[in-house]
Amino acid sequence: MNEVVNSGVMNIASLVVSVVVLLIGLILWFFINRASSRTNEQIELLEALLDQQKRQNALLRRLCEANEPEKADKKTVESQKSVEDEDIIRLVAER
């Protein structure tokens, strides 16, 4: 009789251990799956941000190109600078 009771207790103990291992596995799977889905969301947001930055860079590049002074204007600016430099030299007292 003792052998029958002991075998029943062993079966229940192995069943309890199996259920505990299953629960731990499900809990681990839940947290890993949750972390993975959050990571995927963050990757999607980063890709959207990268796309937006590329569009902003292109727009900024076009804006800078539109506001560049002409090459002829650069020559007149340089000649004005040289005239201003000569004026500064005239202001300095000679000894």
Swiss-Prot record:
Protein name in the entry: Uncharacterized protein YebO
Compartments it resides in: Cell membrane
A GO CC term assigned to this protein in UniProt: plasma membrane
InterPro entries from the UniProt entry: YebO
Gene coding for it: yebO
Protein topology in the membrane: Single-pass membrane protein
Keywords: Cell membrane, Membrane, Transmembrane, Transmembrane helix
Transmembrane spans: 12-32
Protein's UniProt keywords contain Cell membrane: yes
Predominant place of localization: membrane
